């Protein structure tokens, strides 16, 4: 019985070690947004985010291009002031874009979900949920 208990203990320790190590955010990888908080994106809209290794974030906000500085340390991520180009689109796309840009400014930490989705979390509420593009 002792060898079994020792094997079980070692196996459990290995699993805990694996579970505690989060997958990293990939720099210079484009991510495609699927949800803004509690709402999915409008059909056929394409919102993206790339986190450059130089500390600059950028992408497509659905209508306009967006950009911001960001700081990443462990599971904490914060964005500086978010800017964008100023093209006009359909009102529903403009509203979605504003929700996205406001949500980016409220992000405080990140994680990778059990289904390998990048989630950017505000202090309160539901996350922005992204898939790796391509």
Locate each region found by the language model.
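Lipid interaction determinants
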Residues: 7, 18-134
């Amino acid at each position: 019985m002792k060898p079994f208990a020792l094997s079980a203990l070692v196996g459990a320790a290995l699993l805990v070690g694996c579970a505690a190590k989060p997958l990293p955010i990939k720099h210079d990888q484009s991510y495609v947004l699927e949800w803004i908080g509690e709402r999915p994106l409008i059909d056929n809209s394409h919102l993206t985010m790339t986190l450059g290794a130089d500390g600059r974030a950028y992408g497509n906000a659905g209508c306009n291009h967006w950009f911001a500085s960001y700081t990443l340390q462990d599971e904490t991520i914060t964005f500086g002031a978010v800017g964008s180009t100023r093209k006009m689109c359909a009102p529903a796309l403009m509203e979605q874009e504003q929700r996205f840009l406001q949500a980016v400014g409220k992000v405080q930490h990140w994680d990778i979900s059990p289904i390998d989705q990048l989630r950017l979390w505000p202090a309160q509420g539901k996350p922005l949920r992204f898939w790796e593009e391509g």
